[in-house]
């Protein structure tokens, strides 16, 4: 069964970020559930290297919300933020006497979901399925 797109949330994904997922999770755990403006202030002041790509991703998610859905950034908050492990890039480092050792470079995928506080999620089945509710069906459905 295909999941319908929500009208109250916007998602932005950054893939193959050259960073450990453990280090990125340390930053993402600090911003989960906070408002958009508060998140930007926190990320600007954090001393971690992971905060810059997450800052860019939150900014991009807000731009998507404003352009595609017409959300106001002041009403947005981060409803879901997750970091998953990506592929491990392996490179060869040449050593003495013809040997070589592998360098493992870990990557991660970061997902940020913004939700608007002012917009409500549709409650009835008709509203979720068709986007509208007929007055007749509301009156005589009981």
Swiss-Prot record:
HAMAP family, sorted: Ribosomal_uL22_B
Subcellular location: Plastid, Chloroplast
Subunit structure comment from the entry: Part of the 50S ribosomal subunit.
Assigned keywords, A-Z: Chloroplast, Plastid, Ribonucleoprotein, Ribosomal protein, RNA-binding, rRNA-binding
Family membership noted in the UniProt record: Belongs to the universal ribosomal protein uL22 family.
Biological function: This protein binds specifically to 23S rRNA.
Biological process terms in GO annotation: translation
Lineage, opening ranks: Eukaryota, Viridiplantae, Streptophyta, Embryophyta, Tracheophyta
Keyword ATP-binding attached: no
InterPro entries, sorted: Ribosomal_uL22, Ribosomal_uL22_bac/chlpt-type, Ribosomal_uL22_bac/org-type, Ribosomal_uL22_sf
Gene3D superfamilies for the chain: Ribosomal protein L22/L17
Gene Ontology MF terms: rRNA binding; structural constituent of ribosome
rRNA-binding listed as a keyword: yes
GO cellular component annotations of the record: chloroplast; large ribosomal subunit
Protein name: Large ribosomal subunit protein uL22c
Species assigned in the record: Ceratophyllum demersum (Rigid hornwort)
């Amino acid at each position: 069964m295909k999941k319908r797109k929500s009208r109250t949330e916007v998602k932005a994904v950054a893939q193959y970020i050259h960073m450990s997922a453990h280090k990125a999770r340390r930053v993402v755990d600090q911003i989960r559930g906070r408002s958009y403006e508060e998140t930007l202030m926190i990320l600007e002041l954090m001393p971690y290297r992971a905060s810059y790509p997450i800052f860019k991703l939150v900014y991009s998610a807000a731009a998507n919300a404003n352009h595609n859905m017409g959300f106001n950034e002041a009403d947005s908050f981060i409803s879901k933020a997750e970091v998953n492990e990506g592929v491990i890039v392996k490179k060869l480092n040449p050593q003495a006497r013809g040997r070589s050792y592998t360098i493992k470079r870990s990557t991660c995928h970061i997902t940020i979901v913004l939700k608007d506080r002012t917009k409500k999620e549709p409650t009835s089945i008709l509203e979720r399925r068709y986007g509208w509710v007929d007055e007749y069906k509301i009156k005589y459905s009981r």
